[in-house]
């Protein structure tokens, strides 16, 4: 088992760039693989999750070169060119991959099976399987969780699907299946959620009609190849944004080339409403995505009630928001975040256990948390906490060391490599005192 020891650190500074966006990296491999011709991707995130997708696409017959860790060249086989992998496809810990592959493979001529690690095998899959079955797919789960068995050779039909919860993974799975359907497919979301799939499909030449929360996909004859530069992952930048707010020295902490897709940046809105000084500099476009540099300065934060509309736009960043809330003046209330309970861990329970161990006053709700902050002096006592094998829990409590009285020891951190290889080195480069070792 791997472990972090994060010593108290009082300031961070410098200029950094975070690794490429995980969501976009997954999708770049899948869409390039079923496109015509050769696609080039730079800024690719070579994390365990994305490498699981790369390995699976190769097993499905797609030739992929990797000139460097952050570059991939994908030789597309076309919409109908995937082939039987011959054995189960192992998604590792990648929830995005298993859900998107379920949609993509539901339209193929061959049978497939999707499996993963112990954590992934507990993740809910019926939310994806149900609309795909409505389209005519043969998708089977084991009591609602993986392994996922997909029968090949079924003709799919376009449907109108109203998502019961705002989930970009479910929406994307349906849209990938819809590429092969007879007739248009419409997905209606209950709230705004990530739109990377729509942006990337459009850049591949797919006709999409988008009106508010309603997205209609018209099946294409083919997907065009692309040259894609993946921006820095906002979810990875989130840890350093909060670090800068808690302890940036001098002129602040600069985070370069961060993807600022408006369906991902709810954390920016909530942190600014808490008094956070975050300047957006050099805004620009990178492919279909908005990108900018962020300058973060140390700020006196105040507790707020998080607007419900921002929750789906910040769902992966809520663990580190809880760290910021523990350092804010007054109370912070987050509700409507029940989706946290079915991530890599039950993130509400995992964060509560860590906050309890570190002496933070809080109360747990079924769909969120209420946190009483401590704006001056150490907000965290120090001690040992368990990440429950969840990368975002481990990294969030590492950031807490900026306001800790004593060392924070974090157990079970190997899964940080699923999303943020090199996290410890980057954290140390800005001034955090964190070390990784075998427990």
Which stretches of residues belong to each language-model region?
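Structural preference for solvent-exposed beta-strand-turn elements
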Residues: 1-439
